[in-house]
């Protein structure tokens, strides 16, 4: 039987774990192979329906308990619960702006971890590079300050086989965070988005809830000075 693995914070899936990576056939070309990060754990459900008590043990905290364990589950205070953000990017110049926005507009950026699958060719913008100058010349940029909380799996764009496989690689990088979410590579976040989204999740009173949305057009949607949303309606996809 498998239990909930011990965890730490901050954590990485691409930098210090490369000796644990596994090689698998490329899903689009059997004669080729790809090397991928391993999953965080073997199936802790052991092919049985997990009890609520078991499920609520999963989830890291930015501060350990008195025994030094970061895997505190629902005993972790709301503002210390970690958030995993997976991004699949295909040659998207806006990706680094998205990553910057994630950290810059979070109320508690120290609890965010971003895992990017960056499908690029030589000369493309890189998802974890700062927007303006280098980290050496401008170390206060968000990507520089929180670089240890960003993991990037780089793939040659010609090897891409659509968004599903890229997202699979992204989610292989999950490492026990309390909340997990998926974002496009061209998203602008609103101020205190982390607190807002957790409040929405917890307000449902349902442990099985999944929040999803079709994102609103960025034009006239966010106050550039405050970072707050200027829209208070649901997105409308069709007009009649």
Predicted segments — roles?
Residues 2-240:
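Catalytic cores of eukaryotic secretory-pathway lumenal/extracellular enzymes that build
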